[in-house]
Amino acid sequence: MTNHDLASLSQTIETAFEGRDAVNTGTRGAVRDAVETALNLLDSGKVRVAERSEDGTWTVNQWLKKAVLLSFRLNPMELVRGGPGEAVWWDKVASKFDGWSVNEFEKAGFRAVPNCVVRRSAYIAPNAVLMPSFVNLGAYVGEGTMVDTWATVGSCAQIGKNVHLSGGVGIGGVLEPMQAGPTIIEDNCFIGARSEVVEGCIVREGSVLGMGVFIGKSTKIVDRATGEVMYGEVPPYSVVVAGSMASGSTMANGQPAPNLYCAVIVKRVDEKTRSKTGINELLRD
């Protein structure tokens, strides 16, 4: 699809979204065709909700988020088959694997372990491995990435190449508010078990999050070496663990107020060190 075609497609979706109150399951023609085309492009990885430029800036293609939202208005609730014991579900979004045969799986080139769930319009790159996990619509999972057991990749989240999302990790989804960017995990990151990255935060390339690290937009991310406090973004090649900071306030009874949770950057490493050092060794203080 040419840039001109994409521009025309995005304009159709933008216009439809402005008049979304008139879009429903009975809508036919250009609007439905445009949304279906956008979802197919997302599903195949030919377009992404967010794209990284050479300088590290991420640009969000809001029109693709709007296409996903419009699809909820266009598609009726229906039975979704394939559950254990011939059980069914009730939803508006089909499985990515609906109608797939051996040919489609071989062409896609990733591994989908039984009981993983991937919704249509999510893209899974070759050599990725999906353990029993959940990947929501509009998400992007890069080449060679492991999505471990009970991990969740939220709507429109962007996961880079050679990332490891450990067991029970939650990567938040962002469809609304419309102006919000998706949660992003860049290439070669390791996210420890039961950690959560949400609310459009970014974990930059090569970073390691230890087990049980929680990062949202309001979470303080503290560099232990410099004392710098940042929000919403983990710098490249950072090693991060869960910690706490003194609140600096006093309770009514005169006692110091409880410490508050923060994420602590315990060290920063270069690309060479990151590639040669085991995760457990990096996390040791």
Swiss-Prot record:
Cellular component (GO) terms are:
cytoplasm
Q: Which UniProt keywords apply?
A: Acyltransferase, Amino-acid biosynthesis, Cytoplasm, Diaminopimelate biosynthesis, Lysine biosynthesis, Repeat, Transferase
Protein location: Cytoplasm
Asked if Amino-acid biosynthesis is a keyword of the record, the answer is: yes
This protein's record includes keyword Amino-acid biosynthesis:
yes
GO biological process: any one? lysine biosynthetic process via diaminopimelate
**Residues the entry annotates as binding substrate:** R111, D148
Principal subcellular localization: cytoplasm
The protein's matches in Pfam families, at most eight in alphabetical order, are given as:
Hexapep_2, THDPS_N_2
Cystine pairs annotated here are none
> Pathway, according to UniProt?
Amino-acid biosynthesis; L-lysine biosynthesis via DAP pathway; LL-2,6-diaminopimelate from (S)-tetrahydrodipicolinate (succinylase route): step 1/3
EC number from the UniProt entry: 2.3.1.117
Question: Single GO molecular-function term?
Answer: 2,3,4,5-tetrahydropyridine-2,6-dicarboxylate N-succinyltransferase activity
Q: Which reaction does it catalyse?
A: (S)-2,3,4,5-tetrahydrodipicolinate + succinyl-CoA + H2O = (S)-2-succinylamino-6-oxoheptanedioate + CoA
Which InterPro entries would you find in this protein's record? DapD_Trfase_Hexpep_rpt_fam, Hexapep, Hexapep_transf_CS, THP_succinylTrfase_dom1, THP_succinylTrfase_N_sf, Trans_hexapeptide_repeat, Trimer_LpxA-like_sf
Similarity comment text for this entry = Belongs to the transferase hexapeptide repeat family.
What quaternary structure, including any partners, is listed in this protein's UniProt entry? Homotrimer.
Q: What is this protein called?
A: 2,3,4,5-tetrahydropyridine-2,6-dicarboxylate N-succinyltransferase
